[in-house]
Amino acid sequence: MREKLGDSVEIMKERLEDMNMGSGLRRLLIAIVIIYCLITLVLGYLWSSEPESFSVQQNANVLAEELGIEPVIGFTTSVTLMKVAETMLDKSGGYLSNDLLLPGIWLDNIPNWEYGVLVQVRDLSRALRKDFSRSQSQSTQDKDLEIAEPQLHFDNDSWAVPSTESEYRRGI
């Protein structure tokens, strides 16, 4: 009887040790999940702010100086289009509309802001290509705008090959 009782006690001790090992693993997993959630909350807070505004004229003047050219009619518009598109891609957190993981999927305001910027960029690039790049009624279009405008109309949710960001950068 004592042997059976001793065996039962040993079995109970082994089971308790097994449960404690599982409890340690469970605690570790819970700690990892909590840390991950805290990191994503902090990143979400940092990424949810809109980028700084910029002076359109000052931006055009700086770029004209860097390129060593005299700005012509339409230069400021073109440079601003490029700057707005670059700002959308290079802001804090990058381009979030096609994110599949946290915290990107939690942030709905910034992807909506990005979509608004994208609509403006698409509309202006199309207007530049179709209307402004043609001299009066000539059928020839600017070659760079012929390439850029379709790139900026790429699917805004694509995250695989090719990524949305890479297609937009090619358009810029």
Report the location of each language-model feature:
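N-terminal Sec-pathway targeting helices
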Residues: 18-36
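N-terminal Lys/Arg-rich, disordered targeting/topogenic segments
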Residues: 1-23
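Mature extracytoplasmic or organellar-lumen-exposed domains after removal of signal/transit peptides
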Residues: 29-32, 40-172
